[in-house]
Amino acid sequence: MTLQVHVEGRGPDLALLHGWGMNAVVWRALSAALAADYRVHAVEMPGYGVDAATVRADSLDALIETLAAELPPRLRVCGWSLGGQVAMAWARRCPAQVSHLVLLGSTPRFVSDGDWTHGMAQEEFDGFVADVEASLPRARLRFLTLQANGDAAARGVLRMLRESIDEGGAPAGSAPAFGLALLRDIDLRADLPQINQPALVMHGVNDALVPHAAGEYLAAALPRAEFESMGGAGHALFVTREAAVAQRIREFDGRH
C-alpha cells in the first residue's frame, strides 16, 4: 500500500489526518499556514483522494502499520475527528515515532453507550449508516452540515467543506463503511493514561457533532495534555480559523 501524501514546507515533520468522508484538500489552508515552520504531510486516508481506489485498509491495526511505515520515523501528528482517534491509537502503538499530538474536534469514543454520554446516540448513528448505504452523496452532505452547524461562520465553513469534497473526490469502495466501523468500534478511554506524548486538544465550543465535553474528557485523561476551547467554532474549527489554529500549534510546540 502506498499512501497519497501532499507535502509542503520545511522544518519538523507534521502529519495531518482528516476525518470521515473528507479528504486531504480540507487541510489546504492550515497546511499553508504551517508550512513556514513545519514540513507538513497532509495524508489521504486509505480510500480517499484522487487515486482513492488504489489504497485500502481493512483494520485499525493495518492502517496504523501503513502510516508508521510510509511517514517519517519521527513526527508530530495532528488529527481531526476520526483522524484524531487514529492519531491517538498510532501514538499509543508507536511512541518512538509520534512525538506530539494535536487533536482537533476529537474524542476517545464517537458513539454513546451506557457509560459514555459524550457521543452520538446509537440510534442516530445507525440511522446515519443506513443513509450512507442508501445514498453516500446525500449522507455526506448531511455530515458536512453537522460539521458546520453551530459555527459562527457556518455558511462559509459548509461552502469550504463542500469545495474540498468536490475537488478531492469521493471515497472509493469500502472506505466509507470502513470509516463508519472505526467510528462505531474505537474506544480509547482505557488507553489514554498510557499516551504520554505532549498533546494539544482543541475543541469548538459549539461543536454539533462531537460534544465539547468529549474534548474536555480527553484533556483531563491524557497525562500531558493542554486544552484549548475555541469560542464560536463548530466541529470544523480549523477551516476558517487556520491562522489561529496554526499559531496555537506553534505556541504549544514551543512549550514542549
Regions found by a protein language model. Give the residues of each.
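Conserved HGGG/HGGXW glycine-rich cap/lid loop of the alpha/beta-hydrolase fold
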Residues: 2-53, 60
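Conserved acidic catalytic loop of the alpha/beta-hydrolase fold
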Residues: 61-75
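Gly/Ala-rich beta-loop-alpha elbow adjacent to hydrolase catalytic centers
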Residues: 79-83, 87
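Flexible "cap/lid" loop of the alpha/beta hydrolase fold
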Residues: 92-93, 98-133, 175
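Short beta-strand/loop motif that positions the catalytic acidic residue
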Residues: 195, 201-203, 207
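Conserved alpha/beta-hydrolase "acid-adjacent" motif
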Residues: 208-214
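Catalytic histidine-centered segment of alpha/beta-hydrolase-like enzymes
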Residues: 233-246
